[in-house]
UniProtKB/Swiss-Prot annotation:
Protein name stated in the entry: F-box only protein 41
Keyword S-adenosyl-L-methionine listed: no
Lineage: Eukaryota, Metazoa, Chordata, Craniata, Vertebrata
Residue positions, PTM Omega-N-methylarginine: R360
Composition-biased stretches (Pro residues): 170-182
Underlying gene: FBXO41
Domain F-box: 496-540
C-alpha cells in the first residue's frame, strides 16, 4: 500500500508522512514533535468539532444552505481529516503571528460584528458561501469546503428573538390586536416560526454538541485503551522478542553442539566403516581358514577312520596271534613232555659206562673194542653239542629262528647234566652243525651214567632208534614277522637268562649266580673256567628244569614290568630270581628316569648293561656324593664337577642309535655341556633334547657339535636356568646357530639375558616350521619386537610360552593377528621380572596395573580361550 493511500498524514511533515491509524500518528507526534504541538492539535480539534456542529444546526434552523448535515460531514473520514488538518495549521499560524490572510479576516470581522467568529477559521473570506451552497457540488466536495470558515449568526438570532419578544409585548395599532406569540404571554397564541426554529435549532445544537462531546470522550477513552493495549502488547512482544533471542542463542549453541556431534559421529562412522572393512577382510580370511580347517578335519576324520580300521585289524591279528601263541605253547609243552619221556626211555634202555670211559675213551677198566666203540660214538655226538647249544643261545633273539627248537634245548641244557661228570672236548671241524639231538641224548646218558655206574652196558639199538625218532620230530617255525616278538617272549627271557648277564661284569652277589647252569651251557670256555664256575653251583640247582608255569609267569611279569619306573624295577629285582630275571631284561629298560636321588658314575655304568634298548633317558635333579667334613666348598665343587659324565657316557654308548629322547635338567656342576657333546658322538638318532643348567649353559660351540652329530632333532630345550652363573653365554649367536643347524625344528625353548631381537628374528627366519616357542627370562617383548620377529617367520606357530618374560598387551595382539594357527598363549610373570625392588608399594601398584591390562585382553573376542596368565608373587 502506497503512502498517499493512507488516511492520516502528519500536519508538520506534510503529504509524504501518512499513517494508517490515529495511534500511529499520535506516536509519531510524540516521538518526532513537541508536546505543545500535540496539545494545540487536540484542543483545536475539539473546538472545531463543536463549532462545526453548532453552525450546522443554525443553518438548518434558519433554512440557510450553508453546508450539508453536520452528522454527514462528521461521518465522512476525509472531511473530518481535512477539518483537523486545516484547523491545526491555522491555529498554529494564529499562535505564531498574523498570517497573510489576517487583514481579510479582520475586515470580515468588522463587517459581521454580530457573528460569532471562532479563532480556528480555516477557509478564507474570498470564498463566498454561495459557492459552498451550489447545488452542483457533490456531498464530498461540500464536506471538503463547507467548513473552511464557519460563522454562526448568534447575534442575528438573538436580535430576532428580542424583536419578536418586543412585538408581542406592545399591541399593534390595528383594529384587532393579535395575540402575543411570545412564550411569556398567557394567551394561547402560538409562537412565531422564528422562535420555534430558534428553539429547535438551539436544542438540536445542544444535543449535537453533547453527542459530539460524548463521542470525543469515548474516542479518547478508546484511544487510551488502544494505546494501553498496544503498549502492553509491545511489552509482551519485547519480552517475547527477548525470549526468542535467548531461545535463538540457545538454538545456536545447540546447533554448534549438534555440529560438533555430527562431526564426531561422522568420524566415528568413518572409523566404524574402516573397522567393518577390516572385519569383512578378517571374516573372509576366517572363512578361508574355516574351509582349510574343514578340509583338514575331513582329512583327520579319514585318518581316524583308517586308524580305527587299522586298530581293529591289529586287534584281530593280535587275538589270532595270541591264539596261535597259546597253541604253540601247548604244543611246546607237549613236545617238552614227549622229549622228557623219550629221554627217560633212552636213559632207562641204554646202559651207562664209567665216566672215565666217556671222558677219555676207554682209559681204566676193560680196554677192548667193545668198550672203545661206544666211546668213539659218544665223542662223535658229544663234540658238536657245544656249538649247537651256543648257537641257540647266541642267536635266540633272532625272530626267524623257531622257538620250538630253542626253548627245549635251553631248558634241557640248563639242568639235564652235571658238568663235573663230563669233560666236553672241543668241537671238530668236520662235525655237522645239526647234531644237537644226538649231543643232548649223549649228555643225558652221561648224566645218568654218573649216578648209575653200577648198571651193565646194554645194546645201543634202542638208543639209536630213540635218536632217530627225535631227529624225525616235526618242526614248527613262526612265519609272520610281526608276530615274532609276541611268540618269542618265553625264548627271549630264557636266552637273556642264559647269555645276558655274562656279557657284562657282575657288580655283586645279588646279580650273580641265580642261573649258573645256564651260563655254563651258554659259553664255550676252557675246562678250567667251567670247573671254577661248576664249583659254585649246587647239585640241586644244576638239575633244575624251567617249567611251563615259570615261563608263563615270566611272560606275564614282562608285560607288567614294561610299565614300571626305574626305581621300582631296581626294587623288583630283589624279590626273587624270576623277578630279577625279568626286571633286568633290556626290553623293560626302554624308558630310564632318574630324578631326585644321589647317584654315582659306577651306578650309571651298571645300568648301561640293561639299557641297550633304551629310547628315552631322563636325568633330573641328581645330586653327587655328600661333602666331607674337612672338605671346603671349592674343593667339593672341583671334585664333583662332571663326576657323572663317565657313567653317562656308558649309558649313551650302550643305548646308541636306539636313544631318541635325552633330558638333562637341574644337575648343576655334575653334568656339564660336555654331555651334549657325548650325545652327538654316540646317539645320532636323537629327536628331542633338553639341557637346562644354571652353572654350565650351552654355548654356540656345543650347539654346533650337537647339530653336526644329531641332524634329526625336532624338539630342543636349551634355555638356561635362573639364576644363571653365566647369563650371557647363551646369546644371539647361539640362536643363529640353532636356526642354521635345525631348520626343521618344531619345538624350541630358549632364554637368557643374551637373547635379543636380532637372534630371535634370525631364528624365526630359518625355522619356518616352528610350532612351539618358549622364551624364558628374555628382555621385554614389545610390539616392535613382535613385529620384527613375526616379519621374518612364525607363521605356523601354535603355542607361545613366555616364562618370566615381560610382555605388553599390544605385542600379544600382534602375535595373535599374525600367527593365524595360534592356539595357546601362556604368560607366566612375576613382579621380580619387572622391578628390581618388588616389595615397594609403587612397584606393586604398577605391577597390578600391568596384570589388569593383560587380564583385560581375555575379554576380547578370540582371546578368552587361548590366553592363559599365571601371576607369581605380587597379585
Amino acid at each position: 500500500m502506497a503512502s498517499l493511500d493512507l488516511p492520516y498524514r502528519c500536519p508538520r511533515c506534510g503529504e509524504h508522512k501518512r499513517f494508517r491509524s490515529l495511534s500511529s500518528l499520535r506516536a509519531h507526534l510524540e516521538y518526532s514533535h513537541t508536546y505543545e504541538t500535540l496539545y494545540i492539535l487536540s484542543k483545536t480539534n475539539s473546538i472545531c468539532d463543536g463549532a462545526a456542529a453548532a453552525a450546522a444546526a443554525a443553518a438548518a434552523a434558519s433554512g440557510f444552505p450553508l453546508a450539508p448535515e453536520p452528522a454527514a460531514l462528521l461521518a465522512v473520514p476525509g472531511a473530518r481529516r481535512e477539518v483537523f488538518e486545516s484547523t491545526s495549521f491555522q491555529g498554529k499560524e494564529q499562535a505564531a503571528g498574523p498570517s497573510p490572510a489576517a487583514p481579510h479576516l479582520l475586515h470580515h470581522h468588522h463587517h459581521h460584528a454580530p457573528l460569532a467568529h471562532f479563532p480556528g477559521d480555516l477557509v478564507p473570506a474570498s470564498l463566498p458561501c454561495e459557492e459552498l451552497a451550489e447545488p452542483g457540488l457533490v456531498p464530498a466536495a461540500a464536506a471538503r469546503y463547507a467548513l473552511r470558515e464557519i460563522e454562526i449568526p448568534l447575534g442575528e438570532l438573538f436580535a430576532r428573538k428580542s424583536v419578536a419578544s418586543s412585538a408581542c409585548s406592545t399591541p399593534p395599532p390595528g383594529p384587532g390586536p393579535g395575540p402575543c406569540p411570545g412564550p411569556a404571554s398567557a394567551s394561547p397564541a402560538s409562537p412565531s416560526p422564528a422562535d420555534v426554529a430558534y428553539e429547535e435549532g438551539l436544542a438540536r445544537l445542544k444535543i449535537r454538541a453533547l453527542e459530539k462531546l460524548e463521542v470525543d470522550r469515548r474516542l479518547e477513552r478508546l484511544s487510551e485503551e488502544v494505546e494501553q493495549k498496544i503498549a502492553g502488547q509491545v511489552g509482551r512482544l519485547q519480552a517475547e522478542l527477548e525470549r526468542k533471542a535467548a531461545e535463538l542463542e540457545t538454538a545456536r549453541q545447540e546447533s554448534a553442539r549438534l555440529g560438533r556431534e555430527k562431526e564426531e559421529l561422522e568420524e566415528r562412522a568413518s572409523e566404524l566403516s574402516r573397522q567393518v572393512d577390516v572385519s569383512v577382510e578378517l571374516l573372509a580370511s576366517l572363512k578361508q581358514d574355516l574351509v582349510h580347517k574343514e578340509q583338514e578335519l575331513s582329512r583327520k576324520q579319514q585318518e581316524v577312520v583308517q586308524i580305527d580300521q587299522f586298530l581293529k585289524e591289529t586287534a584281530a591279528r593280535e587275538a589270532s596271534a595270541k591264539l596261535r601263541l597259546q597253541q604253540f605253547i601247548e604244543e611246546l609243552l607237549e613236545r617238552a613232555d614227549r622229549a622228557e619221556r623219550q629221554l627217560q626211555v633212552i636213559s632207562s634202555s641204554c646202559g651207562s659206562t664209567p665216566s672215565a670211559s666217556l671222558g677219555r675213551g676207554g682209559g681204566g677198566g676193560g680196554a677192548g673194542p667193545n668198550a672203545r666203540g661206544p666211546g668213539r660214538m659218544r665223542e662223535h655226538h658229544v663234540g658238536p653239542a657245544v656249538p649247537n647249544t651256543y648257537a641257540v643261545s647266541r642267536h635266540g633273539s633272532s625272530p626267524s629262528t623257531g622257538a620250538s627248537s630253542r626253548v627245549p634245548a635251553a631248558s634241557q641244557s640248563s639242568g639235564c647234566y652235571d658238568s663235573d661228570s663230563l669233560e666236553l672236548p672241543r668241537p671238530e671241524e668236520g662235525a655237522p652243525e645239526d647234531s644237537g639231538p644226538g649231543g643232548l641224548g649223549t649228555r643225558a646218558q652221561a648224566a645218568n651214567g654218573g649216578s648209575e655206574r653200577s648198571q651193565p652196558p646194554r645194546s645201543s639199538g634202542l638208543r639209536r632208534q630213540a635218536i632217530q625218532n627225535w631227529q624225525r620230530r616235526p618242526r614248527r617255525h613262526s612265519t609272520e614277522g610281526e608276530e615274532g616278538d609276541v611268540s618269542d617272549v618265553g625264548s627271549r627271557t630264557t636266552e637273556s637268562e642264559a647269555e645276558g648277564p655274562l656279557d657284562a661284569p657282575r657288580p655283586g652277589p645279588a646279580m650273580a649266580g641265580p642261573l649258573s647252569s645256564c651260563r655254563l651251557s651258554a659259553r664255550p670256555e676252557g675246562g678250567s673256567g667251567r670247573g671254577r664256575r661248576a664249583e659254585r653251583v649246587s647239585p640241586s640247582r644244576s638239575n633244575e628244569v624251567i617249567s611251563p608255569e615259570i615261563l608263563k609267569m615270566r611272560a606275564a611279569l614282562f608285560c607288567i614290568f614294561t610299565y614300571l619306573d626305574t626305581r621300582t624295577l631296581l626294587h623288583a629285582a630283589e624279590v626273587c630270581r624270576d623277578w630279577r630275571f625279568v626286571a633286568r631284561h633290556p626290553a623293560v629298560w626302554t624308558r630310564v628316569l632318574l630324578e631326585n636321588a644321589r647317584v654315582c658314575s659306577k651306578f650309571l655304568a651298571m645300568l648301561a648293561q640293561w639299557c641297550t634298548q633304551a629310547h628315552s633317558l631322563t636325568l633330573q635333579n641328581l645330586k653327587p656324593r655328600q661333602r666331607g667334613k674337612k672338605e671346603s666348598k671349592e674343593e667339593y665343587a672341583r671334585s664333583t664337577r662332571g663326576c657323572l659324565e663317565a657313567g653317562l657316557e656308558s649309558l649313551l654308548k650302550a643305548a646308541g642309535g636306539n636313544l631318541l629322547i635325552l633330558r638333562i635338567s637341574h644337575c648343576p656342576n655334575i653334568l656339564t655341556d660336555r654331555s651334549l657333546w657325548l650325545a652327538s658322538c654316540y646317539c645320532r638318532a636323537l629327536q628331542a633334547v633338553t639341557y637346562r643348567s644354571a652353572t654350565d649353559p650351552v654355548g654356540h660351540e656345543v650347539i654346533w657339535a650337537l647339530g653336526a652329530g644329531c641332524r634329526e632333532i625336532v624338539s630342543l630345550q636349551v634355555a638356561p636356568l635362573h639364576p644363571c652363573q653365566q647369563p650371557t653365554r647363551f646369546s644371539n649367536r647361539c640362536l643363529q646357530m640353532i636356526g642354521r643347524c635345525w631348520p626343521h625344528l618344531r619345538a624350541l625353548g630358549v632364554g637368557g639375558a643374551g637373547c635379543g631381537v636380532q637372534g630371535l628374528a634370525s631364528l624365526a627366519r630359518n625355522c619356518m616350521r616352528l610350532q612351539v616357542l618358549e622364551l624364558d627370562h628374555v628382555s621385554e617383548i614389545t610390539q616392535e619386537v613382535a613385529a620384527e620377529v613375526c616379519r621374518e617367520g612364525l607363521k605356523g606357530l601354535e603355542m607361545l610360552v613366555l616364562t618370566a618374560t615381560p610382555v605388553t598387551p599390544k605385542a600379544l595382539l600382534h602375535f595373535n593377528s599374525i600367527c593365524r594357527n595360534l592356539k595357546s598363549i601362556v604368560v607366566q610373570i612375576g613382579i621380580a621380572d619387572y622391578f628390581k625392588e618388588p616389595s615397594s608399594p609403587e612397584a606393586q601398584k604398577l605391577f597390578e596395573d600391568m596384570v589388569t591390562k593383560l587380564q583385560a585382553l581375555r575379554r576380547r573376542p578370540g582371546f578368552s580361550k587361548i590366553l592363559h596368565i599365571k601371576v607369581e608373587g605380587g597379585c
